[in-house]
């Protein structure tokens, strides 16, 4: 459109100038005509957002995402231009939405089941048209999603409760593995070990080196976050992305070895029912020709990294909030004593833990770790009166929406925000619709299991009156605590009247 307007046949400024106009006035008239064209071009879009400005606007907006991080840039632009606005990422029109009605439209329609991101970046991390998380091939995504849904619901979810409780107990008995010379325990690493061990037991069932793989998962996530929206020119300079390639290769090689061991175990098993799980189902699908070896490896990789990545940090944030709000801890402990008592938590207890559930929901609303969803329009559409063309990128700024609509005290952490049932359109920590998080049900149950099991044994305190609000964070692909910052300490005091005191911290 803009190039057409610059075509002299379309918009010839000079033919409107009288022959008597001095030659010296021609440059001024040309500049005025050019400014008029730019203004007309910018006003042609009905969606609020920064101007195109001969291509400078797209460069600036993409640069801001690279500089600030995806989450922070989304908050900046929504605050600047409103809850439905337009920018550009990699030269592609991108909508940033923090309006509940628009989010519901996007989430519930199959027109938006595709993801977006740098093709080269996704290829580097193995997610381009592969796996489930950022797979932008709708056909393959539909093929692999049922495997995840089967593993993460039904019998798998029920079995998870017992497996997770046992893993927590074992890791609390081996705190020395994540304890430094000063006697402090790295809480996030502890959570990552518990999550990885639980996931491995449920979905793969092959012995592994937890410490080694946890570090490799962090390297993989850092590469994923760094490469997701990098411009193509970045990948033409090998030394810029070589370290990310190495991090990805380290984890993928480790997973390939584990999956090969699983294949051998399945082949030599006398009774297949003894080794039936998520990985086995994928291996059988590969043998039938439904999936490739690469598909199988990537799906297992993504299943193993999901909980150690986001849920570990989410649980750490929840522990900080419990330490900051002792009245919340008191209410939770009262409910645990009433519902669970002295025994271990069981699957039947989960639905009765209403205070724990409200606490989890309020934590996910107030300080979400995953606060945005990235989609792409597969066909032309209209959202809340705005035209959306096929191929348009969309970012749903869920974290901002949770603080703008419905809740009585949106900027405070209080369980009052969930005293009444919240309509689903106003609270979507896991999304809904055809591309909602496959693990949203098991994640909620797992968080209840971890909190109940830990809080039955320990009170939670923080040193130096630290609080989550003023802790350094990086809000990019997801919101993570800045692990390069000074130490933030949490104390776990044994719940019984004993002199035992255990301090736990995360190196921030």
UniProtKB/Swiss-Prot annotation:
Its cofactor is heme. Keywords: Heme, Iron, Lipid metabolism, Membrane, Metal-binding, Monooxygenase, Oxidoreductase. It catalyses: testosterone + 3 reduced [NADPH--hemoprotein reductase] + 3 O2 = 17beta-estradiol + formate + 3 oxidized [NADPH--hemoprotein reductase] + 4 H2O + 4 H(+); androst-4-ene-3,17-dione + 3 reduced [NADPH--hemoprotein reductase] + 3 O2 = estrone + formate + 3 oxidized [NADPH--hemoprotein reductase] + 4 H2O + 4 H(+). SUPFAM superfamilies: Cytochrome P450 (SSF48264). Pfam families: p450. Its EC number is 1.14.14.14. GO terms for molecular function: aromatase activity; heme binding; iron ion binding; oxidoreductase activity, acting on paired donors, with incorporation or reduction of molecular oxygen, reduced flavin or flavoprotein as one donor, and incorporation of one atom of oxygen. Heme binds at residue 437. It is a peripheral membrane protein. GO terms for biological process: adrenal gland development; androgen catabolic process; androgen metabolic process; bile acid metabolic process; biphenyl metabolic process; bone development; C21-steroid hormone metabolic process; calcineurin-mediated signaling. GO terms for cellular component: axon terminus; dendritic spine; endoplasmic reticulum; membrane; neuronal cell body; synaptic vesicle; terminal bouton. Transmembrane segments: none annotated. InterPro entries: Cyt_P450 (IPR001128), Cyt_P450_CS (IPR017972), Cyt_P450_E_grp-I (IPR002401), Cyt_P450_sf (IPR036396), Cytochrome_P450_Monoox (IPR050196). It is found in: Membrane. PANTHER family: AROMATASE (PTHR24291:SF43), CYTOCHROME P450 FAMILY 4 (PTHR24291). Catalyzes the formation of aromatic C18 estrogens from C19 androgens. Belongs to the cytochrome P450 family. This is Aromatase. It comes from Rattus norvegicus (Rat). The gene is Cyp19a1.
